[in-house]
Amino acid sequence: MKPKAIRGMNDVLPEASGTWRFVETIVREVIESYGYQEIRVPILEQTELFRRSIGEVTDIVEKEMYTFLDRNEESVTMRPEATAGMVRAGISHGLFHNQRQKLWTAGPMFRYEKPQRGRYRQFHQIDVEAMGYAGPDVDAELIIMSARMWQELGLSRLVLELNSLGSLETRRKYRESLVNYFSAVKSKLDEDSIRRLEQNPLRILDSKNPDMQELIADAPIMLDYLDDESAQHFAELKVLLDAAGISYSVNPRLVRGLDYYNRTVFEWATDALGSQGAICAGGRYDGLVEKLGGRSTPAIGWAMGVERLVGLFEECGGKVPDAGPDVYIVAVGQAALVRGFEISENLREAITGIRIELNLGGGSFKSQLKRADKSGAEFALVLGDDEVAENRAGLKPLRTDQDQASVALEHLAVELAGRLRRNEDSGLDHRSADQDPVSTAKKQTGYTRA
């Protein structure tokens, strides 16, 4: 029996990983341009961390977590989201002691859900968190940052929804109102909603059951219960977004699926990916650090689904630079192969960022040249017994009608660098300089492969 991937956990093959890498690189560069630093946290955490942070009466904790006992009979969970782990790391290492933090992380998350387009049991997220900031200015920055990503990636068909969940006192009053409302229609509630009515009625608003939507639509609205400070916070956030030219709509039913949120919550969604349209979502969680044992620390963050982001990038016609080599070395014979290894490393030293593929596994000149053409390389570097004896190499353009040139090895790096640069300047290069940046060139050629 052949091994197969677990349902809902997908391989990202080479033809797709280039798109992932391109999208992730742009997202990372935007995040770091706002002063956020990367943190890496474990995939496995103690189960209690998620029960305390996400909330016992949530779909994630009740139905979706991958939880098991390790060899010490300790309950551990494969992280369903990253915020709790980042907060735990901050508490463990004293990152919140009289200091503010701007952090981001990325990696796989795990939830036992029904697999469908845009929803998987192993999925990838990029998370950005700002700890120690209480004002609406950082809320605005995080939302504006995400909008900058859409612009850099050339994405469209995204809409932003906002809401405020207010303070703990706001939620207490609103909870009483919800209990009164849903208790009056209890006979119409589904089983999950009846249970949530007793434990956490706000979770009813997050129900995906179509039969519940009409009841939810008529429920009281959180915004009508906001305390003055929360209302002012929300109003100032909207002023900042208006000033930045960010379009949004206020959705009073937006509550998010995690219990730790308060005040600002938001979601970027698209209609381009079917029912799983949320691309990026988050909110403020001012009480979570203290709840998990740290000092009182205001905080806000968002999470972005990479699979959905890549899917939207493709739906919007996004193009990824070709990742093929610049040069394919055709080496016929053992002496030529030895020389090919020598030349390839010398060229990598001379031209920073150059991509070279050396033919391995032998083959005739004709078969190797076919491989060179199939690789997408701009040039074939031809080596045979004659070239080895004369300390020269054949430089054959593969994307133009130019003739093959014989180049002395001592001049090869300069000649090749010049040709690659001319191809870029003339638009013949299969990668554009602004899409494939590398570091400065070696002094030998004064050229950096872009």
Located regions from the model:
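TRNA-recognition modules of translation machinery and tRNA-sensing kinases, especially anticodon-binding
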Residues: 1-450
